[in-house]
Amino acid sequence: MKIQMVLAFAAWVINSTTIMAQETIKQTAGRDQLGDFAPKFAELNDDVLFGEVWSRTDKLGLRDRSLVTITSLISQGITDSSLTYHLQTAKQNGITRTEISEIITHIAFYAGWPKAWAAF
């Protein structure tokens, strides 16, 4: 009886587990904007940061990576085009406007009110 229960549970776990496929993300922003001036920086941006780190979705999903990234940028006071890009990416990765607003509000108490205000 116990073996049957264990086998049934194991089958349920296997059937219920979502396996995230690791797909390489293609990014060309670095090369497009900095390729001639700083080719190594562009390569690291496009191939390592986006091509490798962001593509490790089997370790951390894109939605969570977006949450971490926008939180990090706002906490540092970075509200330029980088934040705009990552907020758009966060929406594409399933984060809603309501969640973004709540994230920024939450950050205000840890990173500082002016940084959060600037992010809105």
What residues fall within each predicted segment?
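Sec-dependent signal peptide recognition
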Residues: 2-8
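Acidic, glycine/proline-rich low-complexity segments that act as flexible tails and inter-domain linkers
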Residues: 19-65, 75-77, 84, 88-92, ...
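Short, structured motif recognition centered on aromatic/hydrophobic residues
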Residues: 64-74, 83, 100-104
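Short amphipathic alpha-helical surface patches that mediate protein-protein
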Residues: 88, 105-108
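Compact alpha-helical subdomains of small soluble proteins
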Residues: 95-98
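C-terminal binding/interaction regions
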Residues: 107-111, 119
